[in-house]
UniProtKB/Swiss-Prot annotation:
Enzyme class (EC, first level): oxidoreductase
Transmembrane segments: none
GO molecular function: 2-oxoglutarate synthase activity; oxidoreductase activity; thiamine pyrophosphate binding
CDD domains registered for this protein in UniProt: TPP_OGFOR
EC assignment: 1.2.7.3
Reaction catalysis annotation: 2 oxidized [2Fe-2S]-[ferredoxin] + 2-oxoglutarate + CoA = succinyl-CoA + 2 reduced [2Fe-2S]-[ferredoxin] + CO2 + H(+)
GO biological process, any: organic acid metabolic process
Protein's UniProt name: 2-oxoglutarate synthase subunit KorB
Gene source species: Methanocaldococcus jannaschii (strain ATCC 43067 / DSM 2661 / JAL-1 / JCM 10045 / NBRC 100440) (Methanococcus jannaschii)
Length: 270
């Protein structure tokens, strides 16, 4: 039996993901992380919005919420305030997080709420038919951009840093070892931890732009990734089309829920 199965709702299998989808890689990395941290199913709550990646919590053997489009961070905030003893993990995608959920993303970072947000970024809307998302690279094709997108792309990690997150990292599905380490750090971080995972979507993004073969897409992700330390010495032209990976931020500052409960206790004593 696969070691991850004990952490999964086996009655929900088989999953709905397309063959070669990166969601399974990310889910496996997450399960490895909680196993290495010795986190039991009753110790964490998984929250998601709408989209392919948002189906991940439905397969996890834990308490979970499958919420409305773009709102998982809002729901997760309420959970963390009510149950600060629980690890709260949000699974989201580039459309769910950066488009309709952009406001919640910004203010979750700003408040520095103790959440671990894992964004599986496949550069496209996968579940609804391959439309352009906020992270679709300039010039890349989608069903709503058959001649190539003319929109500027959003850098999710830069947004998280600017908005106030305390841990920010980016990897791809071709970096599972590094991803496990970052998920562990994110869960242990007392504050808003944002982990972006650039993932393959062979059904839409790959078929339109790279290859419909998952192995080709993972090879592409690996070969086009540049570590942050190397990227610092490269020009903007040299970085064009590359994926900068690594840990961008790891700092400490007051966490929202702790500050809220301190205020409550202070007011009780007055």
């Amino acid at each position: 039996m696969h070691p991850a199965l004990k952490y999964m709702r086996q009655d929900r299998l088989p999953h709905i993901f397309c063959s070669g989808c990166g969601n399974g890689i990310v889910m496996n990395c997450f399960l490895k992380a909680i196993e290495e941290l010795n986190i039991k199913p009753e110790d964490y709550i998984a929250v998601s919005g709408i989209g392919c990646s948002s189906r991940v919590p439905g397969y996890l053997y834990c308490d979970s919420l499958h919420t409305t489009h773009g709102r998982p961070i809002a729901f997760a905030t309420g959970i963390k305030i009510a149950r600060p003893d629980k690890h709260v993990v949000v699974f989201t995608g580039d459309g769910d997080l950066a488009a309709i959920g952009g406001n919640h993303f910004i203010h979750g970072c700003r408040r520095n709420i103790d959440l671990t947000v894992i964004c599986i970024n496949n550069n496209i809307y996968g579940m609804t038919g391959g439309q352009v998302s906020p992270t679709t690279p300039y010039g890349k094709k989608a069903t709503t951009a058959p001649y190539g997108s003319i929109e500027n792309t959003m850098d999710l990690c830069k947004m998280a840093i600017a908005a106030g997150a305390t841990y920010v990292a980016r990897w791809t599905t071709a970096h599972p070892i590094q991803l496990v380490r970052s998920i562990k750090k994110g869960i242990q971080k007392k504050g808003f931890a944002f982990i972006e995972v650039v993932s393959q979507c062979p059904t839409y993004y790959g078929r339109f732009n790279i290859s419909r073969k998952p192995a080709d897409m993972i090879k592409f992700l690996k070969e086009n990734s540049i570590h942050l330390n190397k990227a610092k010495d490269m020009s903007e032209e040299e970085l064009n089309g590359k994926i900068v990976v690594g840990e961008f931020l790891d700092i400490e500052k007051p966490e929202f829920v702790e500050e809220l409960h301190k205020l409550i206790e202070k007011l009780k004593s007055e």
